């Protein structure tokens, strides 16, 4: 399975438009080589570079999406999501744009192909989603971009 974006390549800067300094919409994403037996897809976006004085665990969850149809190969930028979204670290449901307070941060986009459609419960946390996916992950993919405020 592969996860790519038309907006940035692995390890490269995420354009400002997708950050708190821009429009703050989600970037375009493309899923490919999805296992044929997949029943759903999930996506977790996180920043592991958060200063300890902001988050003790150093992690900020930017987006949680699950029960995406495996026939959806693309999410357009700012796309309306026809799936279930979880709660991000800001305490909101939906995409939380990159907005690092101190320096360049890395943003990891993790995609999962699952052999089930998960029970729908809006507002789940990353931990709850990972627990629900346990034993059902067929394939994974990763995309990482960076962002640093001007």
UniProtKB/Swiss-Prot annotation:
SUPFAM superfamilies named among the record's database cross-references: PEBP-like (SSF49777)
Looking up CDD domains in the UniProt record yields: PEBP_bact_arch (cd00865)
Give the disulfide map: none
Identify the InterPro entries for this entry. PEBP (IPR008914), PEBP-like_sf (IPR036610), YbhB_YbcL/LppC-like (IPR005247)
Question: A single Pfam family, by name?
Answer: PBP
Give the UniProt family note.
Answer: Belongs to the UPF0098 family.
Q: Which NCBIfam families match?
A: YbhB/YbcL family Raf kinase inhibitor-like protein
Q: What is this protein called?
A: UPF0098 protein TC_0109
> Which source organism?
Chlamydia muridarum (strain MoPn / Nigg)
Upper taxonomic classification of the species?
A: Bacteria, Pseudomonadati, Chlamydiota, Chlamydiia, Chlamydiales
């Amino acid at each position: 399975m592969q996860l790519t974006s038309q907006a940035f390549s692995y390890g490269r800067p995420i354009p400002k438009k997708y950050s708190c300094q821009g429009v703050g919409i989600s970037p375009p994403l493309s899923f490919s080589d999805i296992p044929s037996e997949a029943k759903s897809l999930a996506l977790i976006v996180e920043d592991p570079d958060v200063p300890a004085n902001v988050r003790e665990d150093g992690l900020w969850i930017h987006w949680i999406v699950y029960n995406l149809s495996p026939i959806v190969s693309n999410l357009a930028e700012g796309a309306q999501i026809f799936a279930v979204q979880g709660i991000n670290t800001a305490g909101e449901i939906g995409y939380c744009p990159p907005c690092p307070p101190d320096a360049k941060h890395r943003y990891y986009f993790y995609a999962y192909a699952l052999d089930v459609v998960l029970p729908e419960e809006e507002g789940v946390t990353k931990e709850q989603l990972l627990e629900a996916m346990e034993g059902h992950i067929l394939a994974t993919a990763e995309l990482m971009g960076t962002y640093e405020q001007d």
